[in-house]
Amino acid sequence: MAANKPKGQNSLALHKVIMVGSGGVGKSALTLQFMYDEFVEDYEPTKADSYRKKVVLDGEEVQIDILDTAGQEDYAAIRDNYFRSGEGFLCVFSITEMESFAATADFREQILRVKEDENVPFLLVGNKSDLEDKRQVSVEEAKNRAEQWNVNYVETSAKTRANVDKVFFDLMREIRARKMEDSKEKNGKKKRKSLAKRIRERCCIL
């Protein structure tokens, strides 16, 4: 008798995460720290880099697909295509750079415009928390913005790995919850459709 085949990667739940934020805030450093446990300080910006990894989320083996987008304005026009494919977003700024914090509003607006959904899974991330002495964006200021958007705010350090796993896992939980919600809604619509069809059929018989 043939042994049971191990669960294939294709059958694992896949959660698609998009990294957004200005250039130089540490999006790639966060991604590479999460993927490979490495801190990369100097990273050449590209249009986008994609990464995939198997992880255990609350006891369930899943896959995370991370698309690390470039923050430079040159690439603004092609971001829409990336945003359409995403299921959740980590919007990153540097706590040492007020300008990058201000830019998060533009990224949020662009995401909402493309996704047409105010409740899209989304986390506001203040990176470079190890550089407290150079802080320009207060925790209170960032938390206030997160509250306005009805999202969570987390501070990270790609250098020390502080909260790196947390932001990716928290976002995956949001994505998973959203998928379950959408699935219930879809099933509810199917049931209502089926019930309406049965009622119509009964009326025809009568």
UniProtKB/Swiss-Prot annotation:
- Cite the post-translational modification comment: Phosphorylated. Phosphorylation at Ser-194 by AURKA/Aurora kinase A, during mitosis, induces RALA localization to the mitochondrion where it regulates mitochondrial fission. Prenylation is essential for membrane localization. The geranylgeranylated form and the farnesylated mutant do not undergo alternative prenylation in response to geranylgeranyltransferase I inhibitors (GGTIs) and farnesyltransferase I inhibitors (FTIs).
Query: Which SMART domains does its entry note?
Result: RAB (SM00175), RAN (SM00176), RAS (SM00173), RHO (SM00174)
Primary localisation category: membrane
Q: Subcellular location, in the record's words?
A: Cell membrane; Cleavage furrow; Midbody, Midbody ring; Mitochondrion
The EC code for this enzyme is 3.6.5.2
Outcome, altering V25M: In HINCONS; decreased GTPase activity; decreased RALA effector binding
- List all annotated glycosylation positions: T46
Task: Give the record's GO biological process terms.
Answer: cell division; chemotaxis; establishment of protein localization to mitochondrion; exocytosis; membrane raft localization; neural tube closure; positive regulation of epidermal growth factor receptor signaling pathway; positive regulation of filopodium assembly
- The propeptide segment or segments lie at 204-206
What is the activity regulation entry?
Alternates between an inactive form bound to GDP and an active form bound to GTP. Activated by a guanine nucleotide-exchange factor (GEF) and inactivated by a GTPase-activating protein (GAP).
Q: Which disease is it linked to?
A: Hiatt-Neu-Cooper neurodevelopmental syndrome: An autosomal dominant neurodevelopmental disorder characterized by global developmental delay, delayed walking or inability to walk, impaired intellectual development, poor or absent speech, axial hypotonia, and facial dysmorphism. Additional variable features may include seizures, autistic or behavioral abnormalities, and brain abnormalities.
| Protein family (similarity comment) | Belongs to the small GTPase superfamily. Ras family.
Protein name per Swiss-Prot or TrEMBL = Ras-related protein Ral-A
Source species of the chain: Homo sapiens (Human)
